[in-house]
Amino acid sequence: MAGGAIVASGGASRSSEYQGGLTAYVLLVALVAACGGMLLGYDNGVTGGVASMEQFERKFFPDVYEKKQQIVETSPYCTYDNPKLQLFVSSLFLAGLISCIFSAWITRNWGRKASMGIGGIFFIAAGGLVNAFAQDIAMLIVGRVLLGFGVGLGSQVVPQYLSEVAPFSHRGMLNIGYQLFVTIGILIAGLVNYGVRNWDNGWRLSLGLAAVPGLILLLGAIVLPESPNFLVEKGRTDQGRRILEKLRGTSHVEAEFADIVAAVEIARPITMRQSWRSLFTRRYMPQLLTSFVIQFFQQFTGINAIIFYVPVLFSSLGSASSAALLNTVVVGAVNVGSTMIAVLLSDKFGRRFLLIEGGITCCLAMLAAGITLGVEFGQYGTEDLPHPVSAGVLAVICIFIAGFAWSWGPMGWLIPSEIFTLETRPAGTAVAVMGNFLFSFVIGQAFVSMLCAMKFGVFLFFAGWLVIMVLCAIFLLPETKGVPIERVQALYARHWFWKKVMGPAAQEIIAEDEKRVAASQAIMKEERISQTMK
């Protein structure tokens, strides 16, 4: 929602006018909403582990099983190069991409709570019913598609909701709660896969338990308050004010509420169709490009290639199935711990610093992994990796995961949720999530084929992209730490590069921002006079 310090013309800081802080109530609201991240996390974590279980492979992917048992001779790099297996992994993201088109309309017209509830229902139906009882690949893919609809809705609305309910000084911390629960979902999935690895049809339980995070999101949608921004936008101003006061723990919310009202007055005349069209004008192009490119960069760190395929990767390198699944648990634990670091650091050091530092860490780790595999495993991998080398590869992957988890992971969700204006926010966040799912689909569909074709070079490929990401973060990304989201567009209008992209609209935005500040101050003055008279 609103929040933070940005210096307006004349040098006046707005942050001192925002009252209230981090209350127990807003913490509880953010905690329940952030649980929606477990939908995406559990699915990401469970997929690769299930794909490495022999019972699952024999039933759905016998070609892969024969390669693993060396019934069919092949390079270890190519063991899992199977189009149907890749479709099983990536089909969810194609469905999620499509669902984002509808989720923006639902979020703007029915509210944030409705989007969360519908997403939870899709996840319960798909995880609890279709995938758990799948009899063939077709049924498995149908379940994945339904899961994709649920993940698409949850991923679009939860970060947006968290940004709208969070106080300015803790927006980064609370929004990263979504990514934290993504990592918790990944860890839980790894533990479940490891626990049922020797059970008959244990893979059914692994897939079926996806219904649990869906149920949590559905229940959360019932008990959570609606976003004050949405209520004001729908004309329920008094209710929006009451919820804002409860979230902030004070009745003195004049400045923040005035900013919301001013933003709504600009957004209200704009229809959903106009919102989508506006995104592609020069006025909003900087935010659109930022959010979309961040999603591209997030996936081309190689993160989902690692998360999806950690068990598969270590199986390919010679680890037994149980050891490969245990490695997944280790990676998941590192992921959770490092994301907790991001929760503490994002509002202290800012978004750009974490992206730059994390990008450098990930790049060095990818280089180390590629060089180690190139030297020890070679192009053909005729022998299993020695245990010390395998442990070294695991350590390097954990360093990569740590660097990603406090940078490109949480920032990939936080930044798009806080840079769009109210009138374009549902459509803008939908485009960001669509980009995430599009590139997740590409990586999920292509990684094992890339591993087969490029061998250890696939890690060097991702390292090259990480260099580009760091440079873009240094030169092209404005720092949004402490900036009220109603005023981020003015930040872009003053940026050395993005003001050129905006063209004449940049000066219009700056003038509108100054006018909005003046209007907010006038409303505050009237309310103070009114309270004094009472």
Curated annotation (Swiss-Prot):
Gene from which the chain derives: HUP3
Stretches in topological domain Extracellular: 42-86, 136-137, 195-204, 323-328, 374-394, 455-456
InterPro entries per the UniProt record, alphabetical: MFS_dom, MFS_STP/MST-like_plant, MFS_sugar_transport-like, MFS_trans_sf, STP/PLT_plant, Sugar/inositol_transpt, Sugar_transporter_CS
A GO cellular-component term linked to this record: membrane
A Pfam short name: Sugar_tr
Protein name as catalogued: H(+)/hexose cotransporter 3
Residues passing through the membrane, by range: 21-41, 87-107, 114-135, 138-158, 174-194, 205-225, 300-322, 329-349, 353-373, 395-415, 434-454, 457-477
Cytoplasmic side: 1-20, 108-113, 159-173, 226-299, 350-352, 416-433, 478-534
Localization per Swiss-Prot or TrEMBL: Membrane
Family: Belongs to the major facilitator superfamily. Sugar transporter (TC 2.A.1.1) family.
Function: Active uptake of hexoses.
SUPFAM superfamilies the UniProt entry points to: MFS general substrate transporter
Main location: membrane
PROSITE patterns membership: MFS (PS50850), SUGAR_TRANSPORT_1 (PS00216), SUGAR_TRANSPORT_2 (PS00217)
Membrane topology of this protein: Multi-pass membrane protein
Organism: Parachlorella kessleri (Green alga)
Disulfide bridges in this chain: none
GO terms of molecular function: monosaccharide transmembrane transporter activity; symporter activity
Keywords tagged on the record: Membrane, Sugar transport, Symport, Transmembrane, Transmembrane helix, Transport
